UniProtKB/Swiss-Prot annotation:
Keyword Cell membrane among record annotations: no
This protein's UniProt keywords: ATP-binding, Cytoplasm, DNA damage, DNA excision, DNA repair, Excision nuclease, Helicase, Hydrolase, Nucleotide-binding, SOS response
Name assigned to this protein: UvrABC system protein B
Domain Helicase ATP-binding: 26-181
Homology family: Belongs to the UvrB family.
GO molecular function ontology, one term from the record: DNA binding
Location in or out of the cell: Cytoplasm
Domain Helicase C-terminal: 430-592
First-listed, main subcellular location of the protein, grouped into a coarse class: cytoplasm
The organism of origin for this protein: Coxiella burnetii (strain RSA 331 / Henzerling II)
Domain notes: The beta-hairpin motif is involved in DNA binding.
Lineage: Bacteria, Pseudomonadati, Pseudomonadota, Gammaproteobacteria, Legionellales
Length: 672
């Protein structure tokens, strides 16, 4: 039931966007393996990519460096492609403590995790969409390179039912048990089913709001329909349905049995090695733990930590890459790596940390050596598996520069804004000079960002400015994501005029009201004063028509020189375009509510409505909770919802459901 990708937007490509779209599409059609979209802040990189996807009509995986940016990109893509499958694939752990052993203190730390039920459903929905539909866009984090169930085993386990099928009810229930669904005749929850005479109701694990009703008559499927699991309202009849497993780690019975045989062989070899090395405690520990896991797999089809046996479950040889989300992609898929200067190093760094932890577990008899193959992809493996790729960055890293067959520039903004003017001023008078600049900007109702090199200096500067009647706040690393969003909102609203921080490169700081960025000690070479960091930081003033960047330095370093030359090159290109097309630059107008616009619920009519007013008083309470407290609170609300449903109080149940949806969606955009 795939449709064509159809972009919905009131805007048309403008500025550099039309030529960038054309070049990217031509590059993809010519078979270029790697391209880079070098786009300045505010140039419409997301819109450009959305247009390219529509033109090439290919399923797309978009990798983001963190959950916050993934949620922002997901929200934008859903608005651009309302008729297509836009999915979200990030880590489903609210809290995660990996299994580990500390030999120095003989401390074993058991794996402990709190799984976010809603994100688990979204992950299952993503793999279902990419399996069934060509018109799919998945927005993911680095979670995409971690081991997932083998796609072949996963797809073999699907339960297909068609109207008119001859099938025994017991056979359907047996298949549901194999998919790890549990029977619950009292209340229907995700990944459960209930039986009432010849009617089987199934709540699919990948579904957010729809359950399936299978009506049998004398071992024949008489009717198939979708219904609302809360109200019982019948939504539509269908000729066929497919039920997907509860988890990506389901495996056909015959493969489970062969897996157990292989585990037995490896266990025997490893026990012999440990005995020869006189590691008797480790030998006993490994034998006990592995035999318990084998018993669980034999009886239930899974065990806690079954992913540690993924080498056998997926039928791979020692050292071969594990199956990941990338294995689920079709052959003609497209890969887009956003903020590639951050995401690429992240992808390269995941393997080593995971390996070191697991080697200790293997050495001390907590796991079999095959557990080492339950791991994220190495970067060289990722490169081999990756389809045609587009990197997106305002400051591409050395890897992108080396790999790219084509660099497509997006320098001109649709608003006509040019990159901020840059000035270098001496360090000796930096504080007093900055104070006078701040007062000028505050008088014009504009905002200032100040970046320092140390926490101490940021604190002293904030104190000094406060003494001089400047309304200032300090953004430090101890501030959580939610408070950070509130600080940014207050800055935009004019509650204060100056924001001081150390690392202002993180997301969410593209604020149109900021007309001055001050970089103190700009001549101290290092991570936060590198060419890329300087370009990114100066770009924070690029959304205001009076944008300016002041670098306080006693000498011009190589990084400063390169950053200033690049900024000047961009300014010249932008000014020339404006002159040619008679464009007068305008500051970006952006409603303040947008920055925290996560309080939205997707209604049955398929459109977003803002629900912030409904539970505004309670939102702060939920946001302030720890992941464990939040999971407990959501479970309590779900119990309340099912209680109403059992008592046939459907309106109350639907209200609680909407409240749960609101909390989840609201937190999705502010979580990291």
């Amino acid at each position: 039931m795939s449709k064509a990708f159809k972009l919905t937007s009131k805007f048309k490509p403008s500025g550099d966007q039309p030529q960038a779209i054309e070049k990217l599409v031509a590059g993809l059609e010519d078979g270029l393996a790697y391209q880079t979209l070098l786009g300045v802040t505010g140039s419409g990189k997301t819109f450009t990519i959305a247009n390219a996807i529509e033109k090439v009509q290919r399923p797309t995986l978009i990798l983001e460096p963190n959950k916050t940016l993934a949620a922002q990109f997901y929200a934008e893509m859903r608005e651009f492609f309302p008729e297509n499958a836009v999915e979200y694939f990030v880590s489903y752990y609210d809290y995660y403590q990996p299994e580990a052993y500390v030999p120095s203190s003989d401390t074993y730390i058991e794996k402990d995790a709190s799984i976010n039920d809603h994100i688990e459903q979204m992950r299952l929905s993503a793999t279902k969409a990419i399996t069934e539909r060509h018109d799919t866009i998945i927005i993911a984090t680095v979670s995409a390179i971690y081991g997932l169930g083998d796609p072949d085993s996963y797809l073999k386990m699907l339960l297909h039912l068609t109207r008119g099928d001859q099938i025994d009810q017991r056979k359907i229930l047996q298949r549901l048990a194999e998919l790890q669904y549990t029977r619950n005749d009292l209340e229907l929850r995700r990944a459960t089913y209930r039986v009432n005479g010849d009617i089987i109701d199934i709540y699919p694990a990948d579904s957010e709001r729809e359950a399936v009703r299978v009506e049998l008559f004398d071992d024949e499927v008489e009717n198939l329909s979708y219904f609302d699991p809360l109200t019982g309202e019948m939504l539509r009849r269908v000729p066929r349905i497919t039920v997907y497993p509860k988890t990506h780690y389901v495996t056909p019975r015959e493969k489970l049995l062969s897996t157990l045989d292989q585990i037995k062989i490896e266990l025997k070899e490893r026990l012999s090695q440990l005995e020869k090395a006189n590691k008797l405690v480790e030998r006993q520990r490994l034998e006990q733990r592995t035999k318990f896991d084998m018993e669980m797999i034999l009886e239930l089809g899974y065990c806690s930590g079954i992913e540690n046996y993924s080498r056998y479950l997926s039928g791979r040889n020692e050292g071969e890459p594990p199956p990941t989300l990338i294995d689920y992609l079709p052959k003609d898929a497209l890969l887009i790596i956003d903020e590639s200067h951050v995401t690429i190093p992240q992808l390269g760094g995941m393997y080593r940390g995971d390996r070191a932890r697991k080697e200790t577990l293997v050495e001390y008899g907590f796991r079999l050596p095959s557990a080492l193959d339950n791991r994220p992809l190495r970067f060289d493996e990722f490169e081999k598996l990756a389809p045609q790729t587009i990197f997106i960055s305002a400051t591409p890293g050395p890897y992108e520069e080396k790999q790219s067959d084509q660099v497509v520039e997006l320098l001109v903004r649709p608003t006509g804004l040019i990159d901020p003017e840059i000035e270098v001023r001496p360090v000796a008078t930096q504080v007093d000079d900055l104070l006078s600049e701040i007062k000028k900007r505050a008088a014009q109702n504009e905002r200032v960002l100040v970046t320092t090199l140390t926490k101490r200096m940021a604190e002293d500067l904030t104190e000094y400015f406060t003494e001089h009647n400047v309304r200032v706040r300090y953004l430090h690393s101890d501030i959580d994501t939610v408070e950070r969003v509130e600080i940014i909102r207050d800055l935009r609203l004019g509650v204060f005029d100056v924001l001081v921080g150390i690392n202002l490169l993180r997301e969410g700081l593209d604020i149109p009201e900021v007309s001055l960025v001050a970089i103190l000690d700009a001549d101290k070479e290092g991570f936060l004063r590198s060419e890329r960091s300087l370009i990114q930081t100066m770009g924070r003033a690029a959304r205001n028509v009076h944008g300016k960047a002041i670098l306080y330095a006693d000498r011009i370093t190589d990084s400063m020189k390169r950053a200033m030359e690049e900024a000047e090159r961009r300014r010249i290109a932008q000014s020339a375009y404006n002159e040619k097309h008679h464009i007068t630059p305008k500051s970006i107008q952006k409603a303040v509510t947008e920055i925290i616009e996560g309080a939205r619920t997707y209604t049955e009519r398929g459109r977003f409505v803002n629900q912030a007013q409904l539970i505004a008083e309670e939102e702060a309470k939920y946001i302030a909770m720890t992941p464990k407290q939040l999971a407990k609170e959501l479970r309590k609300l779900e119990e309340q919802m099912y209680h109403h449903a059992r008592n046939l109080e459907f309106e109350e149940a639907a209200a609680v459901r909407d409240k749960i949806q609101h909390i989840r969606k609201g937190l999705l955009e502010v979580k990291e």
